[in-house]
Amino acid sequence: MKERNTELVQGFRHSVPYINAHRGKTFVIMLGGEAIKYGNFYSIINDIGLLHSLGIRLVVVYGACPQINTSLKEKNIKIIYHKSIRITDLASLEQVKQAAGKLQLDITARLSMSLTNTPLQGANISVVSGNFIISQPLGVDDGVDYCHSGRVRRIDKNAINCQLNNGAIVLIGPVAVSVTGESFNLTSEEIATQVSIELKAEKMIGFCGNQGVINDEGKIISELLSNDIKNIIKKLEKKGDYISSTVRFLKGSIKACKSGVNRSHLISYHKSGALLQELFSRDGIGTQMVMESAEKIRGASINDIGGILELIRPLEHKGILVRRSREQLEIEVDKFTIIEHDNLTIACAALYPFFKEKIGEMACLAVHPDYRNSSRGDALLKKIKMNAKDMHLKRIFVLTTQSIHWFQERGFILVDIEVLPESKKKMYNYQRGSKILMIDVI
């Protein structure tokens, strides 16, 4: 029990920066019909209620594809798609309305639950739906009439913001009205994308059957830049219509990112708590799509000294790194390069040039324990080499007692102390006995 309580306290403390960062921001959450149909759906709804209680402005856009298909099959109505978009004739439209209407009531009812001993106890959430979306027909494509399948014409963002300002969750379904008084069936991905853009949302969040976007090795891709998503989409499209909703979300995320939405996230509807893990932990659990990476390699400034000290102090205590005082770091901070992930310094290294000998020392290489099995050390080494080349240095050397093999695997060779610059030779600590390794700057 004690360990469990400790984990709870630590987890809560680690989430506080994200709670503060998200408060007052607008998130658009897209719940596809597959996510609603799955058994974990009520857990997702509870987590949405939790986000609301933390002061996050929420728009929930839901789809109903599998529910509509079930209704159509029961009525013996033919299911027709063209380019992954449903052909919605009048008979199909009636089933679309019924399925979407039922889900609206079900979601509203679940978010309204406030019984004792339930996750939403005392939440008292207001859920508002309305004619926030004005639609228009898709028309005819390649001779195929989409009938009552439509697209977004405009969004009443003022009405949505009014409800959000009043503390309500705005719930938007796949059926939207038109200026002619007709109803049209829209994809939830398009609605979520357009709403995110119009509201200038901080995040657009979608759910899928996988943990996120999976690479060819079956591993989760934690971050995608918008330019890389296109290649992923091409691969996914070859796999067929069963993943077309994921493809549409990824296409929407490109548009959203380019239009000012800070980040889009794709997470699993299978895993309980995935929404919270994605939003309130440093590395998340799914895939996030961004215009610029959340992880940056840059030169350090005086404001980074605290983060650098947190990285190197444990290694100094173990004798792996030579101890540096805060005062020394303040003087030498311009020699440091850091890797920053979501405003946390996760790796650092320094380059001390000896211009007369055209040689540089790479020192103080440190990586956060959570990232040591990644390639951050390699990324720093590459950046240090680039910096050395810009300084017209020809070689880089390191002094190390623990990481000899790591450097050798990357092309460094053991050398004698005589190759060091004279000033460095005079400072060499024979008692410490560090190995000297060197590499040419290419």
Swiss-Prot record:
| Claim: Cytoplasm is one of the keywords in the record | yes
Could you tell me where this protein is found in the cell?
A: Cytoplasm
Q: Would the keyword Transferase be found if you checked this record's keyword annotation?
A: yes
Q: So what does this thing catalyse?
A: L-glutamate + acetyl-CoA = N-acetyl-L-glutamate + CoA + H(+)
A GO MF annotation of the entry reads: L-glutamate N-acetyltransferase activity
The domain of life is Bacteria
Segments crossing the lipid bilayer = none
Q: One Pfam annotation, family name? A: Acetyltransf_1
Which pathway features in its UniProt record? Amino-acid biosynthesis; L-arginine biosynthesis; N(2)-acetyl-L-ornithine from L-glutamate: step 1/4
* EC number from the UniProt entry: 2.3.1.1
What Gene Ontology cellular-component terms does the record carry?
Answer: cytoplasm
What does the UniProt keyword field contain? Acyltransferase, Amino-acid biosynthesis, Arginine biosynthesis, Cytoplasm, Transferase
Q: Where is the N-acetyltransferase domain?
A: 295-442
Q: Name the Gene Ontology biological process terms.
A: L-arginine biosynthetic process
InterPro entries, A to Z: AceGlu_kinase-like_sf, Acyl_CoA_acyltransferase, Asp/Glu/Uridylate_kinase, GNAT_dom, NAGS_kin, NH2A_AcTrfase
Family membership: Belongs to the acetyltransferase family. ArgA subfamily.
Q: How does it assemble?
A: Homohexamer.
Q: What is this protein called?
A: Amino-acid acetyltransferase
Q: Which organism is it from?
A: Buchnera aphidicola subsp. Acyrthosiphon pisum (strain APS)
Instruction: Identify the gene encoding this protein.
Output: argA
